[in-house]
Every structure is written in structure tokens, then in C-alpha cells.
From Swiss-Prot:
Organism, as annotated: Rickettsia prowazekii (strain Madrid E)
Cellular compartment(s): Cell membrane
Transmembrane segments: 43-63, 190-210, 243-263, 265-285
GO cellular component: plasma membrane
Keyword Protein biosynthesis assigned: no
Source organism, top-level taxon: Bacteria
Manganese is among the record's keywords: no
Highest classification ranks of the organism: Bacteria, Pseudomonadati, Pseudomonadota, Alphaproteobacteria, Rickettsiales
Keyword terms: Cell membrane, Membrane, Transmembrane, Transmembrane helix
Protein name: Uncharacterized protein RP489
Length: 288
């Protein structure tokens, strides 16, 4: 009973701080004068919440893929994968190289008619065109074109010899499904025990580094325009002003990445509240 009361009390305090961080200048005055520490524990707590949500999305996707390749279930996501796999021609793999009998290049499309794969073992497609396709099957390697939220491309290359253990095999949709079924068998457990901690740490470090510039801005302007403000106080103010943006950022990236700009605008607004609070504190001190 005590533990439940402690958790509910902590949750109530956290929700109150989040609400005030986007609505109250007095809240930041209180953080400035009465709060202690750097606010790093607060940042970690907040980054932990969206990280877990992010991990749940990924874990659910991994389980969906695992069930699909094992033939136990299907969904709208896996229907699209099935549609793409069924377009595959017969691919011969021999001594780390692939070849096809059909005329190349061969494009595989999603149900929305987007290019997902291109098979180009003879290197007939330009690099510019290849960069627009997520998966490129060349003669001796698979090229994966990752695209960030800034639309920048980050190609990743995997040699076929790293994927297939046999020296010679004919790749059909059935063999490919079996390959993924075997490799995804323990994927959910591996993700829970290894992937989840990495993602939690990644988001925490990312949020911390992103706020470092804001900390320097607050520290510099606060000391330039008002009374002396310590770096510890500046860090604490920025950590508490970042609550709502931190919680929303991973969720928006997953569900509606087009609205990522709202996170930046919200952070700018809460930082503005911080500056107003500092100016008002300085004004009150000057009248003493």
C-alpha cells in the first residue's frame, strides 16, 4: 500500500511539473530559487517514459514479423511484405554472388506502387536512382538506403556472404521466408534484454546533448543581461523546461514525423518562459 501511494504521489508531482512547465513563469522562478541539483534525474525519468513506448512499438513490430514468417498470423503490414516477396524472381546465389535469368534491372513495388527493391547485378542503374530505393540487390552485396527525418541518405552495405551460410542456393519466396523465420525466432527476447536498454540510453544521451546548446544559451544570456546565474541553475532550468518536448518527441517521430517541427517550437516557447522568469527574478532583486 505504501509503495502504491509513493508511486501515485510521484506521478502526481511529475504531471504537475509537466503542466506548469508549459504554462507558468512562477514555476521556473521556483526551480531557479528553491530546486536543487542539475535536474539530470528528472531528465532521465522523462526520457525513460517515451523510450519504453518507443520500444513497445518496435517489439510489437518484431513479433508481428516473427509470426508472419512462421506462418501463424498476418496483418496489413505483413500483407505488404507478402506482396513484395511474391514479386521476387528466381535468384541464384553462388560463391557470394547473385544472378537472375530475367532482364534487369528488376523493380519490386509496394501495394502503393512505391519502389522498394531493385535487382541490379549488372550495375545498370545510376547511383542517384539507387539512392531513391530502400533496398538495392547488387551482384555481391545488399545496399540498404536509410533515410533520416532530415531526408538525408545513410547507405548501409551487407555482403551476401554475411547472410547466407551455403556456397550455393536458389532463393525463392519460400526459402527467404524460412530464413527470416529462423533468424527472428529469438528476436523478441534479444530485443527486450539488449535492444531496450540501448534505446533507453540512446534517447537519454540524445536528449542531454540536444539540450546542451540551450543550456549554453540560457547561461550566456542570463549572465549577460541579469545577475550571475550558475551553470548548475541553467542546466536545471533547461531540464525542467524540456519535459513535454522530451515525452512527445519519440511518439511524434513514430506516428506523425511531419509534425516534428512542433517539438522545436514547444521547446522554444518553454525556453522563452525560462528567460522571462530570470528577468523577473533580476528585476525583483534590483528593487531590494
Amino acid at each position: 500500500m505504501y509503495l502504491l501511494s509513493f508511486i501515485l504521489g510521484g506521478l502526481n508531482t511529475l504531471l504537475r511539473q509537466l503542466r506548469l512547465s508549459i504554462s507558468s513563469i512562477d514555476f521556473y522562478k521556483d526551480v531557479y530559487k528553491n530546486y536543487q541539483g542539475y535536474g539530470i534525474k528528472y531528465l532521465f525519468t522523462l526520457s525513460f517514459i517515451p523510450s519504453i513506448i518507443y520500444c513497445i512499438f518496435i517489439l510489437n513490430y518484431i513479433i508481428t514479423l516473427k509470426d508472419y514468417f512462421n506462418g501463424t498470423s498476418s496483418s496489413k503490414v505483413t500483407d505488404n511484405i507478402e506482396y513484395i516477396i511474391n514479386q521476387l524472381p528466381k535468384i541464384k546465389y553462388n560463391n557470394s554472388k547473385i544472378s537472375v535469368e530475367e532482364v534487369e534491372p528488376i523493380y519490386l513495388y509496394s501495394k502503393n506502387n512505391n519502389k522498394i527493391f531493385v535487382i541490379d547485378t549488372k550495375n545498370q542503374v545510376s547511383n542517384q536512382e539507387k539512392s531513391k530505393v530502400p533496398f538495392v540487390l547488387e551482384e555481391n552485396k545488399l545496399k540498404i538506403n536509410l533515410v533520416s527525418n532530415t531526408k538525408k541518405h545513410f547507405p548501409s552495405i551487407v555482403n551476401y556472404s554475411e547472410i547466407f551460410k551455403q556456397n550455393e542456393v536458389i532463393l525463392t519466396p519460400e526459402i527467404i521466408k524460412k530464413y527470416f523465420a529462423d533468424n527472428l525466432l529469438y528476436a523478441p527476447n534479444l530485443f527486450i534484454f539488449f535492444g531496450t536498454p540501448v534505446i533507453i540510453l540512446f534517447w537519454f544521451v540524445t536528449f542531454l546533448l540536444e539540450r546542451s546548446i540551450i543550456v549554453l544559451l540560457v547561461y550566456g544570456l542570463a549572465n549577460l543581461l541579469t545577475t550571475k546565474t550558475s551553470i548548475q541553475t541553467s542546466i536545471r532550468l533547461v531540464m525542467f523546461s524540456s519535459g513535454i518536448p522530451i515525452i512527445l518527441q519519440p511518439v511524434i517521430i513514430i506516428l506523425i514525423p511531419e509534425l516534428s517541427i512542433l517539438i522545436q517550437l514547444l521547446q522554444m516557447f518553454t525556453t522563452f518562459l525560462v528567460f522571462v522568469a530570470i528577468l523577473q527574478i533580476n528585476k525583483s532583486l534590483s528593487h531590494i
